Amino acid sequence: MTNANVDATPLTTKPSQDGFYMPAEWAAQQAVWMIWPYRPDNWRSAGAYAQATFAKVADAIGAATPVYMGVPKAFLAEAKTVMPSHVTLVEMDSNDCWARDTGPTVVVNDNGECRGVDWGFNAWGGHNGGLYFPWDKDEQVAQQMLKQHGFARYSAPLILEGGSIHVDGEGTCMTSAECLLNANRNPDLTKEQIEDLLRDYLNVKQFIWLQDGVYMDETDGHIDNMCCFARPGEVILHWTDDETDPQYSRSKAAFDVLQNTVDAQGRKLKIHLLPQPGPLYCTEEESKGVTEGTGVPRTAGERLAGSYVNFLITNNRIVFPLLDPATDDIAAQKLQEIFPEYEIVGVPAREILLGGGNIHCITQQIPSGK
């Protein structure tokens, strides 16, 4: 690990030209990044509940992988008292704490060298349905993380959040039209142009387009809350059997796409179904602790986009959200069946869900290379 003062000037080539690609999440990892939550207009009690939850997530990850946490200078002393001692705190400004979406996508080559892709970011929609303003500090997060590791940087001409893509490391990229083709992300680009940019910067060949993500997902249906790869040729889909639930039609449509597609290696997909928790709703008490600001309001009675698919694979561990006593054990058992070689660790994560995401959304892995 270096703390090199890397030139901020981005590379003029593209990862695919240079032999770099985005590895799958199950590839070996040298670190996982998180960011300190503090926005009072998104996190109740100015983030106090969320901070305690983030500490538990960091602890669960830290048993398998070193954890770095970006923290604004004003909160460093507080973070030291809350976070486990093994977490490396890095002074870093941010508008909020979604490391998956503001952090870099680290790409590797066959020699084990790592570089980072720095995507454009507009807070999930900019002035057309975005979740807060401003987002200028978030736009600097990826560059700061890459500097910490001494990785060279590619600057991609595409608004994209890390939670909107999943890859299998063998040429396949899965995403959702609800997000990537949304007019509030890249309105001047066609689907084909977006695919071309993903080929350039992820070095993928085949795309699996699901139409929609999870019902009421304020990110416009991020794929990481809806469906993910378990290993090459296998996916895990957020599911409900209740045909009267608004989620049913979304999951059924996704299932139909997955059942009738092949990956970049020509494989038919094995589909695992992970039951949805709840439905879950924000309570009056939970909404009271959030102040008014530029962030999206947190309203009592609002349905939460809870999903067990929003887990992190990190080295020998799966860290997944505990969201509903009625379904947590079922989710854990299902994950253990899908991942028999992994340790399955659940962390109570409702506080993250109240802020609009979950464990995968607040983490960003740094692959080891080889």
Swiss-Prot record:
Protein name: Putative agmatine deiminase
EC number: 3.5.3.12
Active site: 361 (amidino-cysteine intermediate)
Taxonomy of the source species: Bacteria, Pseudomonadati, Pseudomonadota, Gammaproteobacteria, Alteromonadales
InterPro entries xrefs: Agmatine_deiminase, Peptidyl-Arg-deiminase_porph
Keyword annotations of the record: Hydrolase
Gene name tied to this protein: aguA
Catalyzed reactions: agmatine + H2O = N-carbamoylputrescine + NH4(+)
The keyword Hydrolase belongs to this UniProt entry's keyword annotation: yes
GO biological process, one term: putrescine biosynthetic process
Gene source species: Shewanella baltica (strain OS223)
EC top class, as a word: hydrolase
Organism superkingdom: Bacteria
Membership in a protein family: Belongs to the agmatine deiminase family.
Pfam families, per the entry: PAD_porph
One of the record's GO molecular function terms: protein-arginine deiminase activity
